[in-house]
Amino acid sequence: MWFRTANLALVLIAALAAGPALSAELSPDAINSSEPSKKSVSKDKATPAGVRLQVLLDRAHFSPGEIDGKFGENARKALRAYAEAQQLPSADRPTQVVWKALRADEQPVNSDYAITEKDVAGPFLEKLPSKMEEMKDIPKLGYTSPREALAEKFHMSEQLLAALNPGKNFDRAGEAIVVVDTGGAERGEAAKADRIEVDKTRQTVKLFDKSNALIVFYPATIGSEEKLSPSGTLKVTEVSRSPTYRYNPDYHFKGVRSDKPFTIKPGPQ
């Protein structure tokens, strides 16, 4: 028993020690002065250069997914798409030529934000059910905390938000915090899309303008083993910003026991 207690104590000490260290490393100054390179980004660890790279890609309308400071697969996909759009050599890492194009946006990639009454008003869920059948009885698939809502609002992971704001109270209106700035002073609206390319194999969505130039990129989860997405040329006939999910029992999703159709309310906006 003593060994288990001692091991647990060591784990807790290590976790507490890692928190301040990570926060110090991911300071606004460190992030804004960082230079992404093969050595300064990591798929396993959040780094200042990883944060800056992800934010600049997001500003350019080439989404790396959730901004967490890590150079994971979604960030890699976004970087490749950005290089393609800029007619630069394909890049799996932030090469000098690609970074030169991205860093033309010289605005800081973070900004100060004061938490509002609306941010903390809720209502918040105690816990989001893991099973689909349990979700159908919830009036709205909301967030579980102000911290989760704030992270989503600024395209960030909760872990990165916490690392940038050690000791801050995310439940208190008026609290000043640091967030990543995916808007940026120079960001404008993307050109109007004329064509959408959904790649089921690469799990990506690309938007092209009338001149066939790539203007927007998103990583995406497309279809599943139970419900394959259609192939071919389709036409967008309707856009729903708050869609209701409708479960069809004919697909027999894993983990879903219901033999009757049901709906799941829209999530937060």
Describe each region flagged by the PLM:
Residues E73-D119, A162-R195:
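Extracellular LysM carbohydrate-binding repeats and other cell-envelope/extracellular binding modules
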Residues P64, R147, E158-P166, V179-D194, ...:
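N-terminal post-signal-peptidase region of extra-cytosolic proteins
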Residues R52, F62, N74, V97, ...:
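Extracytoplasmic
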Residues A24-S42:
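Short N-terminal segments immediately surrounding and downstream of signal-peptide cleavage
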Residues A18-G19:
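N-terminal signal peptide c-region/cleavage motif recognized by signal peptidases
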Residues E189-Q269:
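Gly/Pro-biased beta-strand-loop elements
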